[in-house]
Amino acid sequence: MAFPNTSAQQAETNSKSLEEIHTRKQLLAGGIMNLGLSNTNQMPAPQLLGQPSTTTATPDLVSTNSTPPRAAFNPSSSTTLGFFIPQDSYFGNSLIPVLPRLELPATPSTTTPPITPIANANNPK
């Protein structure tokens, strides 16, 4: 026969579970704050290419022990129309490209050649 579970025991079990969850949340939040991470956005404002850079904050966001991404950041940011968002990634993609959408120029209707019917070789008219 199963043990009878009264409402008092159930309430006590629930409160212990909630207390344990609360302490785990505090530990996780404390660990994130100790690592120096916060909820505020620490990324600089995106800068369009072709404009001279006045700050050096963007390359500093790339991890300091990875020189290939930093070496790739400088030429790529100076030769493209978009801009790049540096990030720390375990997967090796330390730069996220952001490319602008470019509108195609409107073509006038006079530039399209007129459609001519093809004469049937068997029935010339």
Curated annotation (Swiss-Prot):
Q: Where is this region: Disordered?
A: 1-20, 38-74, 105-125
Q: Which GO terms describe its biological process?
A: DNA repair
Indicate, by first and last residue, each region the UniProt record lists as having compositional bias (Polar residues): 1-16
Q: Which GO terms describe its cellular component?
A: nucleoplasm; SOSS complex
* InterPro entries cross-referenced by the UniProt entry: SOSSC (IPR031821)
Which Pfam families does this chain map to? SOSSC
Question: Which family does the record assign?
Answer: Belongs to the SOSS-C family.
Q: What is the protein name for this chain?
A: SOSS complex subunit C homolog A
The lineage, from the top, is: Eukaryota, Metazoa, Ecdysozoa, Arthropoda, Hexapoda
